[in-house]
Amino acid sequence: RNDLRVPVYASTDMVTYQENEPVSEGMMRGFCMHALAQGADGVYLFNYFFNDYNRGRYHTEPGEQTCRVPHPRMLHELGSRETLEGRNKIYWLSDGKREYGLRPNTPLPLCVQPQQQAEVSLFVGDRVDSIRPKELILFYRTRQPASLRLWLNGKKAMKMVPDYVSIYNKGVKLQNGEQQYAVRLPAKALKQGDNVLRIENADTASEVTIKRIELALKYGSADTHGYF
């Protein structure tokens, strides 16, 4: 055979580390879309088991927006960009946890000094020029109370939405002193490819350490467009 092409498959094993947030349906979509949009030939679903616990049925977390239990229906979505387009999903940066001797390529945890700025980049694989999400939500976790100003691709964040933390089940595994925040970003600011999030610490005296950053793309209700 003259075909020397070697297919490359992305593995989802990074989302199974015990210290990380328990993986959710929306996070799996974001992971797979990220990999496929970067040119992967497919996705290897590591430890993606359908247990007797739920028998393949949906099991949502408090708030009814998030599902953290794998089920067979997701196999119809995760292997193709076409089936992932227009579905609710979450993109996130690695927390920087080290397991099995691996060093994640991530800016987190990120320390921002008082009244200083920092930037991080989040890759989005969705073709947002043709199908734009109805709502764009940024979730971030800090090691202490924080007062941040945020911009996405130069567009300022719209408003804090504290109730989203519980609605989307983002308060899990909080350690002593850690805080979880949610803020709406302008959906028009989102683009396919790298998105620059600029972060400013508004505090005049204390540094802030950002432990987790997640970007949720909401195209519609969880019932019709998928759970987060």
Describe the role of every protein-language-model region:
Residues 1-18:
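Glycoside hydrolase catalytic-domain groove-lining segments
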Residues 127-137:
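Extended extracellular/luminal ectodomain segments enriched in beta-structured repeat modules
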Residues 73-103, 111:
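Pro/Ala/Gly-rich low-complexity, hydrophilic intrinsically disordered segments
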Residues 15-19, 50-54, 145-146, 158-159, ...:
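Flexible loop/turn segments at secondary-structure boundaries
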Residues 19-85:
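Substrate-binding cleft of secreted/luminal carbohydrate-active enzymes
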Residues 141-225:
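Beta-strand-rich ligand-recognition modules
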Residues 112-128, 180-181:
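Short beta-strands within extracellular/lumenal beta-sheet-rich domains
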Residues 11-13, 45-46, 153:
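Generic beta-strand/beta-sheet core signal
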